[in-house]
Amino acid sequence: MDDKGSQRALLAQTVNEIVKLLIEAHNQKKDVNLNRLKCIVAQKNGLSFQPKLVDIIAGVPADYKDTLLPKLKAKPVRTASGIAVVAVMSKPHRCPHINFTGNICVYCPGGPDSDFEYSTQSYTGYEPTSMRAIRARYNPYLQTRGRLNQLMQLGHSVDKVEFIVMGGTFMSLPEDYRDFFIRNLHDALSGHTSASVEEAVAYSERSKMKCIGITIETRPDYCLPRHLNDMLLYGCTRLEIGVQSTYEDVARDTNRGHTVKSVCETFHMAKDTGYKVVIHMMPDLPNVGLERDKEQFLELFESPAFRPDGLKLYPTLVIRGTGLYELWKTGRYQSYPPSVLVDLIATILSLVPPWTRVYRVQRDIPMPLVSSGVEHGNLREHAMAKMKELGLKCRDVRTREVGIQEIHNKVRPEDVELIRRDYTANGGWETFISYEDPKQDILIGLLRLRKISDKAHRAELKGNVSVVRELHVYGSVVSVADRDPKKFQHQGYGSLLMEEAERIAREEHESDKIAVISGVGTRDYYRKLGYELDGPYMSKTLDASSAA
């Protein structure tokens, strides 16, 4: 037997031994350090490398898959929020505002004209999502199937999938390409080959793998009523809007190609269409300074003109080939020192209200490509440690989610209460309803309800209408057909939140109708609650009889 063959035989022997020891530990209710176990068994058997997690998962007998796979799951945080997120990228294309500003944003590293020529706009091509997209030659079907297979091999459930469409301004691409891209995302879940977006959505609705939502990255100038309407047809439920700064002078100096006033108008239109709105912000931009940075985040969370549902924080990075790189090289721009940046991020996180979710705290760009800027690969952890030191708390949605709390703090909720928070934002009345354990500050499920303003452009939402912009019960992904008493999805919290939303809409908003912006794969859930398809929404007429 050649060397490769003997190593394969040793690998099989090692995997069998590891699985046997894991089963013994499970039966004896003992905890095991898997990395240490892999190292010891591989060394004992003379294996020159440690077996991969995928190999161990494949070696688990069918009888033990249900009990061992949750313990073996790689990066459990990937599905801790109850959803398997699949990020996909559209083909490389030029930034749309080049036509009227003459250039891209000063800090933007990617795109077809950049040093990273096979990358999409604002990406280098070396981020994990970019590399998967390049391997698949930006084919949406191959990107989706590849990522789903990867997640399944690592022990994750892919019963509920949320797509994030990345790679620049997707809505600036030609309509036929956009239709092709979205059609293939839905077809990758259903296995059907569709001729149109409508057909793809119809099959996706009945698929075993449910598309519970699509998130699209866009800009204020590509978030007009016609764009909002197209995205509804795709099954999009959340928008990520690149804003970067709330200061008009900074938007102008960094060559954003839009005004902050247009950002506020976009937020208003998007929320009146039912979308969840996530904002991208960049601390440490040129000509801002520490105090102005703190003030803009205070304004972001407190001013009714903004108040986003989610936030992605991308501290400014200096990358070769950008306008900012030239400013930095000639001494006209200097990044914050690492300790100052950590302090700033800690301050920002302490300002986040309990109805906002912080999705990211830094870019995925590999550190060797960064000339100046973030020096820590785990900036969020450093900021959280600083907050603990200063006695500050981060109360954003992600920090308080039950799934995240279980992973990081081994804490489970005990006394669960219905909690309500009301605020005004973007011309409408917002109500954030949640089931929480207030004593331990753990969040189990949430619902975002909005009384639509009179500026709504959709016919389905005109008049006295309330809209549910988000319903989410947290905890590890549970198959739609299963009920696991230790997990919080499918335990009835969702229907209780919907009942309360209907009561508020009927009695306080005095609405005649309640609509839900629903992911394609969750429409059946709302049908069971008495909702009917109403254009792209699921709607229900509210009257006195529905109060029973």
From Swiss-Prot:
Molecular function in Gene Ontology: 4 iron, 4 sulfur cluster binding; metal ion binding; phosphorylase kinase regulator activity; tRNA binding; tRNA uridine(34) acetyltransferase activity
Record CDD domains: Radical_SAM (cd01335)
Catalytic activity, as annotated: uridine(34) in tRNA + acetyl-CoA + S-adenosyl-L-methionine + H2O = 5-(carboxymethyl)uridine(34) in tRNA + 5'-deoxyadenosine + L-methionine + CoA + 2 H(+)
Cofactor: [4Fe-4S] cluster
Keywords on record: 4Fe-4S, Acyltransferase, Iron, Iron-sulfur, Metal-binding, RNA-binding, S-adenosyl-L-methionine, Transferase, tRNA processing, tRNA-binding
Pathway as given in its UniProt record: tRNA modification; 5-methoxycarbonylmethyl-2-thiouridine-tRNA biosynthesis
Residue ranges annotated for the Radical SAM core domain, each copy included: 78-368
Cofactor-binding details, from the entry: Binds 1 [4Fe-4S] cluster. The cluster is coordinated with 3 cysteines and an exchangeable S-adenosyl-L-methionine.
List of residues binding [4Fe-4S] cluster: C95, C105, C108
Superkingdom of this protein's organism: Eukaryota
Domain N-acetyltransferase residues, every copy: 392-548
One matching Pfam family: Acetyltransf_1
Presence of the UniProt keyword Ribosomal protein in the record: no
Coiled-coil features, chain-numbered ranges: none
Name of the top EC class for this enzyme: transferase
Residues annotated for acetyl-CoA binding in this entry: K160, E470, L471, H472, V473, Y493, G494, S495, Y526
Enzyme Commission code: 2.3.1.311
UniProt key word Nucleotide-binding: no
Gene Ontology CC terms: cytoplasm; elongator holoenzyme complex; nucleus
One biological process term in Gene Ontology: oocyte development
InterPro entries (UniProt xref): Acyl_CoA_acyltransferase, ELP3, ELP3-like, ELP3-like_N, Elp3/MiaA/NifB-like_rSAM, GNAT_dom, Radical_SAM_C, rSAM
NCBIfam families noted in UniProt: ELP3
Function: Catalytic tRNA acetyltransferase subunit of the elongator complex, which is required for multiple tRNA modifications, including mcm5U (5-methoxycarbonylmethyl uridine), mcm5s2U (5-methoxycarbonylmethyl-2-thiouridine), and ncm5U (5-carbamoylmethyl uridine). In the elongator complex, acts as a tRNA uridine(34) acetyltransferase by mediating formation of carboxymethyluridine in the wobble base at position 34 in tRNAs.
Subunit annotation: Component of the elongator complex.
Family label: Belongs to the ELP3 family.
Name of the protein this chain belongs to: Elongator complex protein 3
Provenance organism: Caenorhabditis briggsae
